[in-house]
């Protein structure tokens, strides 16, 4: 019978962000493969421990609730991340984690550089144009090739609508995270 890792129960902090999921074992020494939800998995790689929850739908898991997984090593590998964790010492233990969702507290993310933003910080921000006209609230961001696009949700005549604005300096004048607002050079009829 395979030896399953012993994981410490933990509370999921209110600022926890889902950053990826464990997809498979990698090798025979307990390493496992992770699908990061960002093209730049910096927050995942910088964390000394991850919070895991079982897969949402249908997958079997040997643990319930939230558990703490101390990370020994993590690095990028092609378009994924491979990691090795404390207590995960062979392929069977790594396979037992398959499907687990990975969370990291937002407070533990590395500091973003100038004019760099974590998507999680932009979602929910109201967007106004230079004239102060409300254009909507950021509902999502889409990678659209050379740039990212803001997806705004707004209502018009009582019906929900979407508006898309390229997230580039030609249209985005200011992102004020402290003031919780994005100002753009955009009109409601675009």
UniProtKB/Swiss-Prot annotation:
GO terms for cellular component: cytoplasm; ribosome. InterPro entries: PRC_barrel-like_sf, PRC_RimM, RimM, RimM_N, RimM_N_sf, Transl_B-barrel_sf. Its main location: cytoplasm. Keywords: Chaperone, Cytoplasm, Ribosome biogenesis, rRNA processing. PANTHER family: RIBOSOME MATURATION FACTOR RIMM. The PRC barrel domain binds ribosomal protein uS19. This is Ribosome maturation factor RimM. It comes from Acidovorax sp. (strain JS42).
